[in-house]
Design a protein with these regions (language model features):
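Alpha-helical cap/lid subdomain in secreted, periplasmic
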Residues: 3-149, 153, 174
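Conserved catalytic region of serine esterases and O-acyltransferases that act on ester linkages
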Residues: 142-196
């Protein structure tokens, strides 16, 4: 079955496509190799423009985590019934994540997965998790999250500044738009986005 996203991608010749994957999909090296990589290749194959620039939106670590996070193993059949038909799978075939001891370890695992993707796909990969991690350590008063997973208005503005820099290669500190944020916070976020 063709998804709406696949229909849109194949409907025209795109110059830029930004791909995002759920962070949990990046916690298993095997899952990245067997599913994420092939999903990216499928997206690329649907686009008519062979000179398209592809970016991978490397999302941030969730805000609230109780560490350690135990290794989670899920049957391969839960992920893709076309790629892993249930009747062809041994019931023991699973994707397993690593145990995550702390937030720094979580960041390391995400970055390793993205390096794995980049080695094969040669995509521009955003630096969101490292930027969020550093802001959390250096500016704990800045609330980047609305809830455990989603960005607040401040976090969304930071994300927009990061993408502005990635897509245009222009300095976001020159933008006058502040999204209704106070000047001090907006200026700091623009500087951080520009320096990464």
């Amino acid at each position: 079955e063709i998804t709406e996203t696949e229909k849109i991608i194949s409907s025209r010749s795109w110059d830029l496509i930004i791909i995002q994957e759920a962070p949990d999909m990046l916690l298993s090296k095997e899952l990245v190799n067997e599913l994420v990589q092939s999903d990216i290749e499928k997206i690329k194959s649907l686009n008519r423009n062979k000179n398209c620039k592809y970016m991978f939106f490397n999302t941030w670590i969730p805000k609230v985590q109780n560490y350690p996070i135990k290794s989670i193993c899920l049957p391969k059949s839960d992920f893709d019934y076309v790629k892993f038909p249930v009747n062809n799978l041994n019931s023991d075939e699973k994707f397993c994540s690593e145990e995550i001891l702390n937030k720094k370890e979580h960041l390391r695992i995400l970055n390793e997965a993205l390096n794995q993707i980049n080695l094969k796909q040669k995509m521009t990969i955003s630096n969101h998790p490292n930027i969020h991690f550093n802001i959390g350590n250096n500016y704990p008063e800045i609330q980047l999250y609305e809830d455990e997973y989603h960005p607040s208005k401040i976090g969304s503005f930071l994300n927009a500044c990061i993408f502005y820099k990635m897509i245009t290669n222009k300095n976001p500190t020159r933008l006058k738009f502040n999204a209704g944020l106070d000047e001090k916070t907006a200026s700091l976020l623009k500087r951080i986005a520009n320096s990464n």
